[in-house]
Amino acid sequence: MALKGRALYDFHSENKEEISIQQDEDLVIFSETSLDGWLQGQNSRGETGLFPASYVEIVRSGISTNHADYSSSPAGSPGAQVSLYNSPSVASPARSGGGSGFLSNQGSFEEDDDDDWDDWDDGCTVVEEPRAGGLGTNGHPPLNLSYPGAYPSQHMAFRPKPPLERQDSLASAKRGSVVGRNLNRFSCFVRSGVEAFILGDVPMMAKIAETYSIEMGPRGPQWKANPHPFACSVEDPTKQTKFKGIKSYISYKLTPTHAASPVYRRYKHFDWLYNRLLHKFTVISVPHLPEKQATGRFEEDFIEKRKRRLILWMDHMTSHPVLSQYEGFQHFLSCLDDKQWKMGKRRAEKDEMVGASFLLTFQIPTEHQDLQDVEDRVDTFKAFSKKMDDSVLQLSTVASELVRKHVGGFRKEFQKLGSAFQAISHSFQMDPPFCSEALNSAISHTGRTYEAIGEMFAEQPKNDLFQMLDTLSLYQGLLSNFPDIIHLQKGAFAKVKESQRMSDEGRMVQDEADGIRRRCRVVGFALQAEMNHFHQRRELDFKHMMQNYLRQQILFYQRVGQQLEKTLRMYDNL
C-alpha cells in the first residue's frame, strides 16, 4: 500500500527514471521496500519515479516520524558489507543496443527445453526477455511495476565479501578507511561491476583460463593481434519451416576460413550470441546486430538488407582481436553437433569471467602512463566520438533522403521528361505529308531513353547508397556504446583521486590507494586499446565506403552517358 513520506534533502534527477524532490516536500511512497537504496514514489507535482531512500522519511499515522532505516536490506547503505561481484549463477547487467542497462534472467541451465534452439521464435529476442521486476532503461526498474514486492531480489547479484580473496594484499582490518561507493547504484559504473573491481572487491580466480594481452604500439596501447586470424562469410539466406509449416524462419550459411564445414544459423542464434557478448565484454564496444522486424521479415528486400548488415557485423567481429577469440563465438561458428551445441551454450551461459571478472583476464604493459595524460586522451576521444556520432547521423539522414529521391522524385521527373518527348513525337505524326519518320523515331527513342534513365536512378541506391547506409548504421551502434564505456573510466579516475586524497589526509593507507591506482591502469589500458582499434577499423571501413560509393557513381553516370550517346547518334543522319 502507498505510504506518505517527506523529503529530507533536495535531489535532482539525472535520467528519466528518476524524479526530483525538494526538502520538506510531501511524497507518496509506493512501497518501503528499497532496491539498492532507491524507492519509487510520486512527488507533489504528480511525477512518478525513483529517488534515494536515504533522502526521505516515512510519515506514519499517529506516530512521530522516524527516518527510515534501510541498512538491513541487501541493498543497504553504500558502506554495507556486500560485494557487487556477480555470482555466475545470476545474470549480471549488460549494455543494450542503445547504451542502456538491463538484467537478463537466465533461469536454470539444466533444462533441456531451454536449449532447443529450433523452438525459438523469431518474434522475440533474448534481450527482450527480462522478467517483471527486471531493470529498464538506464538500469532502473520499470515504472509500471505493481506493489508491494515490485523489486524481486532474485534479479540482483549480491554476496558477502570474501575476507581473504581481496585483490589487495592488505587485510581490510588494516585499512584506515574505504573509498565511498556511488550513491546512484544504477549507474553503469556500478552495474558493470567496474566500481567493485577498482575498489578490489572482485575475488581473484584460482585459475584464469583465458587471457587477453595489451601491448604498446605506435599510437599507444593496442590489443595484441589474434594469433590465428580468420574471416567468415555470410551467405545464402534460406527460408526454412518446421512443425509442418506452422513456423518459418530464415537461416544463414556461415563459412569460417578456419573451419572445415559451413554452419547454418538463424537470427535468433545471432541474438543469443550478442547477448552473451554484452554480458561478458564490459569495456569493449560490441557491434549492434541489424534491427529486428515484426512484419515483412520474409520479404526479399528485408532479407537482403539483413544479410548485408550481418556481413558487416561478422567482419567487425572477426577483425576484433578480443571478440574473435571468445570461446562462445568460436562455438557459434564451428559447432555442427546438436549435443555439443547445447553443452557449449551452457558453458557460455555459466562463464564466470564476465563483467567485472573479465577485467581480471587482461595482461597490461609495464610502461608507466600518467593518469592525467590518460584522462586527457579519454576526454579528446569523448569529444571526437560525440562529433563523429553527430556527423554520421547527418550523413545517414542525407543519404536516406537521397534514396527516397532516387526511388521517387528522380524517377518521376525523368519519366515526365520522357513522356513529354514522346508527346512531341506523336504530335509530329498528325500531319502525314510533312511527317519525318526518322525524326519522329529519334525523338520517341529519346523519350524512352529518359524513362529508362529514370528506372536506372531508382535502382542505383542498391549499388552505392545502401552500402553507405549499412556502414553508417554499424558505426552509429558502435559510437552509441562509448558514452557508457567512457563513463566507466571516468568513474575509475574519480576513485583514484578520492583514494589519494584520503591517503594524504591519513584516512587510508598508501598501499590501498596504490592498489586502486593499479586497477585503474587496467581499465585505462583496456579503454585506450579499444579506442585504438576503433580508429584502425574506422579508417579502413570509411576508406572502403567512400571508394565503393565513388566507383559506383562513376559507373552509373558512365551508363547514363552511354545511353545518351546512343540516342544522340540517331540524329546524325537526318
Curated annotation (Swiss-Prot):
Residue span(s) of domain SH3: 1-61
GO MF, one example: identical protein binding
Region feature Disordered, mapped onto this chain: 68-119
A GO BP annotation: endocytosis
Domain PX residue range list: 230-340
Pfam families: BAR_3_WASP_bdg, PX, SH3_9
Keyword Cell division attributed: yes
Keywords, in A-Z order: Cell cycle, Cell division, Cytoplasm, Cytoplasmic vesicle, Endocytosis, Membrane, Mitosis, Phosphoprotein, Protein transport, SH3 domain, Transport
Stretches with biased composition (Acidic residues): 109-119
Family: Belongs to the sorting nexin family.
Name recorded for this polypeptide: Sorting nexin-33
Organism: Homo sapiens (Human)
